[in-house]
């Protein structure tokens, strides 16, 4: 039982990096001053976690990650924020990109390792962000979700990161597939391109009571387009 380890709880900021203890609960992510200021996408998405106040007050960011449940909310957001993780093992401490850890077998930690911290850079002041989630009821798991981070040069996309969750066993980072939109203006045609590319991105799809595979493929494109559209609008408001 690691629940009584105080060093795994809390949020700090030092030398331009934010460290979040693995046992920090979702409610803290929603309300912490550092997270709300520097990582507003994470604060917002933590409030969208299903299960009500019990899960928000007891569920932890580390548990959310290592459970590797495909319908959970936090992993796509942390991937869009380019998070690293710190892992403690008998041979020492290592740091790795979250995307690398998630891509490894299971959660990539092994039986003798422990996720201790999530490490992130603050979002840039000009960044726009959004988290879109489709779900059947207010407290249910998501059927499809997407996190987006953008920055603009005028009306042209200079940064575009999109990660789609709840449609496949693993979150899908669409950023490379959407690379061709960088330097292009955001308009209806760009939105249609995001939807088309992200709809075709999943190789295998979940098929369960939250939605069948055909519906999920369609919704992967929809949530991605909506997330980018909302993130662009956010960036435009921020930079007025």
Language model: regions and residue ranges:
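C-terminal structural segment of proteins
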Residues: 1-240
């Amino acid at each position: 039982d690691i629940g009584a380890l105080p060093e795994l709880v809390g949020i700090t900021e030092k030398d331009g990096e934010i460290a979040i203890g693995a046992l920090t609960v979702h409610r803290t992510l929603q309300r912490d001053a550092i997270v709300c200021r520097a990582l507003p996408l994470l604060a917002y998405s933590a409030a969208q976690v299903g299960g009500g106040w019990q899960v928000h007050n007891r569920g932890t960011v580390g548990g959310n990650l290592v459970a590797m449940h495909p319908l959970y909310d936090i992993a796509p957001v942390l991937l869009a924020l380019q998070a690293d993780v710190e892992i403690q093992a008998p041979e020492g401490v290592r740091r790795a990109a979250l995307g690398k850890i998630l891509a490894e077998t299971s959660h990539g930690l092994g039986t003798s390792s422990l996720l201790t911290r999530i490490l992130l850079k603050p979002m840039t002041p000009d960044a726009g962000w959004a988290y879109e989630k489709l779900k059947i009821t207010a407290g249910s798991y998501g059927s499809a979700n997407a996190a987006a981070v953008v920055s603009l040069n005028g009306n042209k996309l200079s940064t575009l990161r999109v990660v789609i969750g709840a449609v496949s066993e693993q979150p899908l980072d669409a950023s490379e597939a959407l690379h061709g939109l960088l330097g292009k203006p955001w308009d209806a045609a760009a939105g249609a391109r995001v939807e088309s590319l992200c709809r075709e991105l999943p190789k295998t799809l979940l098929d369960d009571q939250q939605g069948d595979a055909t519906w999920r493929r369609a919704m992967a494109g929809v949530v991605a387009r909506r997330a980018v559209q909302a993130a662009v609008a956010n960036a435009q408001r921020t930079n007025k």
